[in-house]
Swiss-Prot record:
L-aspartate binds at residues 174, 220, 445, 486. It comes from Flavobacterium johnsoniae (strain ATCC 17061 / DSM 2064 / JCM 8514 / BCRC 14874 / CCUG 350202 / NBRC 14942 / NCIMB 11054 / UW101) (Cytophaga johnsonae). Belongs to the class-II aminoacyl-tRNA synthetase family. Type 1 subfamily. NCBIfam families: aspS_bact, PRK00476.1. The keyword Transmembrane does not apply. GO terms for molecular function: aspartate-tRNA ligase activity; ATP binding; nucleic acid binding. Residues 198-201 are annotated as: Aspartate. Homodimer. Keywords: Aminoacyl-tRNA synthetase, ATP-binding, Cytoplasm, Ligase, Nucleotide-binding, Protein biosynthesis. ATP binds at residues 220-222, 229, 479, 531-534. This is Aspartate--tRNA ligase.
Length: 583
């Protein structure tokens, strides 16, 4: 037996107990006649003491050779600690060591294994197995495990069945590029790694597995951002014989359950807003509603004056920033420079100070009087002491720019408290979106999403106005889940493929198996998928998902620890019938 207890469980009630511990040397303090060693494992730290007057000489001398991160086993007696440490659970005791075994030595780590380390991100990713020993990373992985267990418990209690679906599937157009896997036994043919288990979970519904879930790896070969990984994990769910309301209720319940069990928070409100309302009011379809600053459209009050910039704009829109009326000109100019950055792309910005006496001071006083600006204040719900910032230009582009400014200001003003949680549903998404370059419509979610029955007639005349039975769950400005009611009959699915530009032959080649299944009695069904990585990061109060993934990739999609991806040798390429052009 390597250990009778772990390094986080012993306390004063264990005094005089003989114990065996094993772990890593965190640090040691050699005072000549006395040597203290902090022994660490996943559960905590226990102090060991080697006393020249009470410890066997051989053991005492061996303890002096211990280095950082040596793996050791000790046997000894729990005794009361003279200098108690109230900051750790084991701070009342220490172990008077009688036996010491060095299980493995260790090189000096390239960074300190401490909560606050001196290692940069690159070196910590290269030695990720060492980084996992640090409390912040270890605790993030344990936190992820707890969330996953609560998900399984909640769904299992509702009679959901966890079913695994294949990882080697057929490449189909789902939006992002597929990762492809060559088949040695089928020359010139390839599998793809799934971007989601979408078609398989629909086939499970046809198969009668009416409540399915899976915590599953998915893969997308796309350009990476700080919050994206080429492989990611979904809480994937599907239900048969349900309407949209049934699905929203189940997964609203899951979210409430997680917030209560993980964070101890009861959620009172769970608003539902339409996609159109979200875009008009917040400028994006995943609004952060922990704070206000709703958009106020100002065309009616700002145009038809003498200010040519607003007169030429498709949209004039502003937000009221609480308490920002005392911003200096330097601070305002800094914000103007911020919105002019290429990442935002605004050409300029107008500001209005809402004075405490009910008057207004703006950068366009030459064109607008106090009564005009009072109307702007009313439209943006501005109060005395606030500042109104106004952008103008093409409607969609301007809303996106103001949305970016809204989020930046909320961050600067401390309005995005990571311990406050404000979930909501966004519903009634457009079924299709137009690609302006190709002139073709694309499915906003995926081609299996059903249109709202009352909008079916619009498919022939105004396809861009057709609404989908689709819904996203948003938490603190992040889309954490999305889903839809699916098409479950062949005729409607064929019609959808037609509007997406598929020929009959292409649709059959790509998705014939699904349409065939629909002919054998497919039930009405729908589902949803949560992004587990993003969900645990938000619940854990962190900005990046990497901290919650054991072995993440970097921003270039590389695993620098194992140096992947990597070339394969010519023999493997030949066996796979692959020839690589010169690079």
């Amino acid at each position: 037996m390597y250990r009778s207890h772990n390094c986080g469980e012993l306390n004063a009630s264990n005094i005089n107990t003989e114990v065996t511990l094993a772990g890593w040397v965190q640090k040691s303090r050699d005072k000549g006649f006395m040597n203290w060693v902090d022994l660490r494992d996943r559960y905590g730290i226990t102090q060991l003491i080697f006393d020249e007057s009470r410890t066997d000489k051989t053991v005492f001398e061996l303890a002096k050779t211990l280095g950082r991160e040596f793996v050791i086993q000790v046997k000894g007696t729990v005794i009361e600690r003279e200098a108690k440490n109230k900051n750790i659970p084991t701070g009342e005791i220490e172990i008077l060591v009688s036996e010491l075994t060095i299980l493995n030595t260790a090189l000096t780590p390239p960074f300190t294994i401490e909560d606050e380390t001196d290692g940069g991100e690159d070196i910590r990713m290269k030695y990720r197995y060492l980084d996992i020993r640090r409390n912040p990373v270890k605790n993030s992985l344990l936190f992820r495990h707890k969330v996953a267990m609560e998900v399984r418990k909640y769904l299992s209690d509702l009679d959901f069945c966890e079913v695994e679906t294949p990882y080697l599937i057929k490449s189909t157009p789902e939006g992002a590029r597929d990762f492809v896997v060559p088949s040695r036994m089928n020359e010139g043919q390839f599998y793809a790694l799934p971007q989601s288990p979408q078609t398989f979970k629909q086939l499970l519904m046809v198969g009668g597995m009416d409540k399915y879930f899976q915590i599953v790896k998915c893969f997308r070969d796309e350009d990476l951002r700080a919050d994206r990984q080429p492989e990611f994990t979904q809480i994937d769910c599907e239900m048969a014989f349900v309407e949209q309301e049934d699905i929203l209720n189940v997964f609203e319940g899951l979210t409430r359950h997680l917030l209560k069990e993980i964070k101890g928070i009861e959620v009172d409100k769970f608003p539902r807003i339409t996609y159109d309302y979200a875009m008009k009011t917040y400028g994006n379809d995943k609004p952060d509603i922990r704070f206000g600053m709703k958009f106020g459209e100002l065309n009616e009050f700002a145009q038809h004056k003498e200010f040519p910039v607003f007169n030429a704009a498709e949209l004039v829109v502003g937000i009221a920033v609480p308490g920002a009326g005392n911003y200096t000109r330097k601070e305002i100019d800094g914000l103007i420079d911020w919105v002019k950055r290429p990442q935002v792309g605004a050409s300029g910005m107008v500001y209005v100070k809402c004075n405490e006496d009910g008057t207004y001071k703006s950068s366009v006083d030459k064109f607008y009087d106090n009564d005009d600006l009072a109307k702007w204040a009313k439209a943006t719900e501005a109060n005395p002491g606030d500042m109104i910032f106004v952008l103008s230009g093409p409607a969609n582009k301007t809303r996106a720019q103001l949305s970016a400014l809204r989020m930046e200001l909320a961050t600067r003003l401390g309005l995005r408290n990571p311990e406050e949680f404000a979930p909501l549903w966004v519903v009634d998404f457009p079924l299709l979106e137009l690609d302006e370059e190709s002139g073709r419509y694309h499915a906003m979610h995926h081609p299996f999403t059903s249109p709202k029955p009352e909008d079916m007639a619009l498919l022939e005349t105004e396809p861009g106005k057709v609404r989908a039975n689709a819904y996203d769950m948003v938490l603190n400005g992040n889309e954490i889940g999305g889903g839809s009611i699916r098409i479950h009959d062949k005729a409607t699915q064929q019609l959808m493929f037609k509007y997406l530009g598929f020929t009959e032959e292409e649709a059959k080649a790509q998705f014939g198996f699904l349409m065939d299944a629909f002919q054998f009695g497919a039930p009405p069904h729908g589902g949803l998928a949560f992004g587990l990585d993003r969900l645990v990061a938000i619940l854990g109060g962190q900005e990046t998902i990497r901290d919650f993934i054991a072995f993440p990739k970097n921003n270039s999609g590389r695993d620098v620890m194992i140096d992947a991806p990597a070339a394969i040798d010519d023999a493997q390429l030949k066996e796979l019938h692959i020839k690589i052009d010169s690079i």
